[in-house]
């Protein structure tokens, strides 16, 4: 089926996945709040990432670094000098656009070219395309553009009571630098030998020129990043390892391979620190978008921080007796983007045998579903007994309890929020201590002893 972004956004709002930020005050552009189901979904995604990339990995450990860092960090990392986007303004609408995205949107929507990449083009090359193609502002419909200029993406703030340059700080634009400055602390305290990785999940902030597409590109966002350190010369081998590992993590959690692709960056598209980068992209209803960047950052970050801080980041290899600064592979995943991908991939409208009405269903992997099961008393007269099943299961799983409206409407409601199993407690349950368990995807129903429910769910929702 062809999926519509507006329909998915409306479902997300209606069912409590995502709400507009500051909604009662008219909102704030491009801010979103995760509702009761959205926060459960996103937390389950983060848990699944941490489980596979940190807890179950023989290589990796985790940290949680501060958002506010010494400003020298950003000077050393290159963010103060290099963390810029190409900005262009339409003189009539007074709206500012990111030039490369303006071009890419035009090529996709007007030319049907989904693979055109403007990142890496010079300012002159981008301006020539805009002029030659007659690309217009989506609002004013005019091509009255300024020249393209650099725009630094970091949010500036101040610590203390005075707002002067000595108290200037920045909200971190990525979580990675908190890992790099802690490299020696982690390596020494955990007695790690190469290869090993350090991962973390946390908020980052970028003053994006043209955010949009719901939670895909926002100014406040969450990252799940791993910095994996290895011997120079082995970085491409490890990059390939993490490309496969990341792709399998997505497909194991029910992301369709048909909606995924791996795209290698061209040489002129690479970031200043990278000698090889591959993006795992997802086909959203609005087009292909980056989910996961898997970059070989070489020794750039550790070398920069070594030079600026005076700290020695050389690793003494016990096997070869060499000393060198490790290379780094970075699989960087946006938590909000991948949450959107799971929402889009799970969404379906399906016909129901014997009914003229279609059902809307979210086919989440059970490990990601906000609720693992819903307990549904057939009648409110049975609620006092059915609630005991809820209490029994909710100590181990996220369980919903729903006693309002007909059982059919409750099934549809649970389908629409992606609950894998509905447990119906009926009048026979009072006598035989069994319940009816309905499967979300197949809609098949089986009778099961109440005593077996916990074991059944544990097996079905594991990842």
Curated annotation (Swiss-Prot):
A Gene Ontology cellular-component term: cytoplasm
Reaction(s) this enzyme catalyzes, per UniProt: tRNA(Gly) + glycine + ATP = glycyl-tRNA(Gly) + AMP + diphosphate
Residue sites binding substrate per the record: 98, 174, 221-225, 330-334
InterPro entries: aa-tRNA-synt_IIb (IPR002314), aa-tRNA-synth_II (IPR006195), aa-tRNA-synth_II/BPL/LPL (IPR045864), Anticodon-bd (IPR004154), Anticodon-bd_dom_sf (IPR036621), Gly-tRNA_synthase/POLG2 (IPR027031), Gly_tRNA_ligase_bac (IPR022961), GlyRS-like_core (IPR033731)
GO BP of this protein: glycyl-tRNA aminoacylation
Residues where ATP binds: 206-208, 216-221, 290-291, 334-337
Assembly, per entry: Homodimer.
NCBIfam families tied to this protein: glyS_dimeric, PRK04173.1
Function in brief: Catalyzes the attachment of glycine to tRNA(Gly).
HAMAP family to which the protein is assigned, alphabetical: Gly_tRNA_synth_B
Name of the protein in question: Glycine--tRNA ligase
């Amino acid at each position: 089926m062809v999926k519509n972004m507006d329909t998915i956004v409306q479902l997300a709002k209606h069912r409590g996945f995502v709400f507009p930020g500051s909604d009662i005050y008219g909102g704030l552009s491009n801010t979103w709040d995760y509702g009761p189901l959205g926060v459960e979904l996103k937390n389950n995604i983060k848990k699944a990432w941490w489980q596979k990339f940190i807890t179950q990995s023989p290589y990796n450990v985790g940290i949680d670094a501060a958002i506010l860092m010494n400003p020298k960090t950003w000077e050393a990392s290159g963010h103060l000098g290099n963390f810029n986007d190409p900005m262009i303004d339409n003189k009539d609408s007074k709206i500012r656009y990111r030039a490369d995205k303006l071009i890419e949107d035009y090529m996709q929507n007007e030319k049907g070219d989904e693979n055109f990449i403007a990142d890496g083009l010079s300012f002159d090359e981008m301006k020539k395309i805009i002029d030659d193609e007659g690309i217009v502002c989506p609002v004013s419909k005019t091509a009255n553009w300024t020249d393209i200029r650099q725009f630094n993406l970091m949010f500036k703030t101040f610590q203390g009571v005075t707002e002067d340059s000595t108290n200037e700080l920045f909200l971190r634009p990525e979580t990675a630098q908190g890992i790099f400055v802690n490299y020696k602390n982690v390596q020494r305290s955990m007695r790690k030998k190469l290869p090993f990785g350090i991962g973390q999940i946390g908020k980052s902030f970028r003053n994006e020129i043209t955010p949009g597409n719901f939670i895909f590109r926002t100014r406040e966002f969450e990252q799940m990043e791993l910095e994996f350190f290895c011997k120079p010369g082995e970085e491409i081998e490890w990059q390939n390892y993490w490309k496969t590992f990341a792709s399998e993590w997505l497909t194991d959690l029910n992301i369709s391979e048909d909606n995924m692709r791996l795209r290698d960056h061209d040489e002129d598209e690479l970031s200043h620190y990278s000698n090889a980068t591959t993006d795992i992209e997802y086909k959203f209803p609005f087009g292909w978008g980056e989910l996961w960047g898997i970059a070989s950052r070489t020794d750039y970050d550790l070398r920069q921080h070594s030079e600026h801080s005076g700290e020695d980041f050389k690793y003494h290899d016990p096997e070869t007796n060499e000393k060198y600064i490790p290379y780094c592979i970075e699989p960087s995943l946006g938590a909000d983007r991948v949450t959107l991908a799971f929402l889009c991939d799970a969404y379906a409208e399906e016909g129901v045998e014997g009914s003229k009405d279609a059902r809307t269903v979210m086919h989440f992997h059970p490990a990601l579903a906000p609720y693992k099961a819903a307990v549904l008393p057939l009648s409110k007269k049975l609620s006092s007994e059915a609630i005991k099943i809820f209490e029994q299961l909710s100590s181990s799983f996220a369980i919903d309890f729903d006693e309002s409206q007909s059982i059919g409407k409750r099934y549809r409601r649970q389908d629409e929020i992606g609950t894998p199993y509905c447990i119906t407690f009926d009048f026979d349950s009072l006598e035989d201590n069994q319940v009816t368990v309905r499967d979300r995807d197949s809609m098949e129903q089986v009778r099961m002893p109440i005593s077996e429910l916990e074991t059944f769910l544990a097996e079905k929702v594991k990842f």
